[in-house]
């Protein structure tokens, strides 16, 4: 019978089978039903159960040869404080399979064996143990004087569990602080798996087995703070020297973390003979330690293969404790004749912030021709990286920097990177034409025989005036050397190095007498920052020959992230806001008559511009929202007067990295005089603003911040000729109007207070324009509604723009960031509706302005109380 059919059939079997047995007076009591079928024994839980002693009936059936299925039926099973002194009290199954499944919560807590060499609380051999389809599983603070603090079995399959699985603080006097097995499968679990603070006196702080397959788990795996003699978290070794044993496979898991594990001897996180790590999500080995192999130790004659298929593989701050060298950084230790088969970075990087150490091979493998090469392959934009960038200056000793590989290295494709003073030693290294070797200045590559390089890249950002790339080899061939400049490194922003001419900058050091590679090309690709020319030559000393570079500085081109014209263009934002304010105030001269009124209105304005230079840095948008309030009067003769004040809160941003917050304080006055033939109106407005600039750099480390002040005034004077129709159409009257508008704004210069600090000069903007248009209106006495529509063509008569230079304070370099010169022609449309409600009058005002490189919208909602 299949295990997944057992749960469905157990109740029927109870009724129909003559061999059905009910146990009522033991630890299970009425919580479970045990049935014996021809080929299996089934224990089905009928309710939650808590035990401090195993059911005698359950123990009796466990000792039979038939497979035993313990089915939770989505109930809970808690076992705690169980301390058996004899095998009769222990859950011991010596033949047949055992399956514990379908529990909502399965817990074994504070259970222990009290006699020496006694097995685990759950001990199973000569069969398979299944823990599957459970929700939460917890094995906490269990102990065994034998092997397997919580579980001991020949074959364990921990599969298809779906909430959380936790092995914590279990311990063993021998092997496997939590689990001891010959074969172990942790596969296809939806639940996250955590092994934390488990310990074993011998091997495998959390797990000890001969074969481990960990694959297809869709939530993270955590191995943290476990400890043992060998294999702080996992020990998977060949104790019987059988070639098919001692294999560990981590594959297709979502995320895996080994952190804080320790071993007194070998393998801070893992000690195994054969290991394959492939096609996982992110895998991290962090802060693990051992005498040999801070993170991973490979047994003599074994092998290790790492394929970063779904995320990066990281080794960081792992350490080993040599008696003669103290504590040094170490990621991987390969014992005698153990091989590092491949490093493949496909969809993630392989990052070694700790070195690799490989023992010297035995004499029969001492010739490079007999050794299997280490194959390095990476996809585009991925790399195998050796780096010491996370070490302090004091920690950068040779023992913490050097990776010793005893196999030939074949760089078959992609990119191998040596960074920040690391040293790579190997018998030989060969490079395929499509592969790239990247070496920072200060790094070293040493081979005892042939070194054949097709392309060597030296990153410009690593250059200083003292160190060089060092290569030591009896025979050397380099076809091409070039200097690489990553757009993210900003090498050409280096003030100390590039602001003046430099002589004899060391790049590459070779043993004397080796043939010189061709000189790098001095015509580098276009870039921002300091501009200049490179020249290269070889210099010879007593024992070395050095490739040196000479730099001749010419000019400076600022990075686009520094060039934003948003500060100067803020005056355009102020201009647009004041146009919106004037539009709102003009509505007080329209509508029904009243002796005196007080009013308030919400004001909003949206302004978009794409400049006229074609640069994305000149595109910007501005949004403002605020309020106006005032007093006004509007006579029957259409004379009007208004005083207003208000505040606007604005947000501006370009299409790159710069934004500005604005707080504006506004005061305005408006008047209108009307006769039967003509209406004359005038308006003046004053604006004082405080601006705060924020630059969230993508290419520089610090955020920029600055603040400045601006003042602006605007005004208009206009005349309109009203023409009254018969009132039967859509509008009752229309008028032809013309205005003369003026705006003048000035903002102070300022310096940014942090980040890539810049100084901005004063700027000013003056504009005189002539709107000409036609307006339509309709008054409805029945509904007390008033409608007004206006359309106008605007021609700018005179414009004066003054914007000073921007200065980068760290090098005093200046450049222009001119204010946008938008089109001098514009179209403006406005629609207003007012409705009288006894003493209250509501207002809706919408306007739209279209200019050659910009457009704006405004919307006002207000009310007037009429006395």
From Swiss-Prot:
Keywords in alphabetical order: Cell outer membrane, Cell wall, Membrane, Secreted, Signal, Transmembrane, Transmembrane beta strand
Chief location of this protein within or outside the cell: secreted
Gene: pmpI
Name of this protein: Probable outer membrane protein PmpI
Cleaved signal peptide residues: 1-29
Ranges of residues in domain Autotransporter: 591-867
NCBIfam families xrefs: POMP_repeat
Stored Pfam families: Chlam_PMP, ChlamPMP_M
Membrane topology: Peripheral membrane protein
Subcellular compartments: Secreted, Cell wall; Cell outer membrane
SMART domains xrefs: Autotransporter
Organism: Chlamydia muridarum (strain MoPn / Nigg)
Cellular component annotations (GO), alphabetically ordered: cell outer membrane; extracellular region
Protein family: Belongs to the PMP outer membrane protein family.
Coiled-coil residue spans: none
Disulfide cross-links: none
Superkingdom of origin: Bacteria
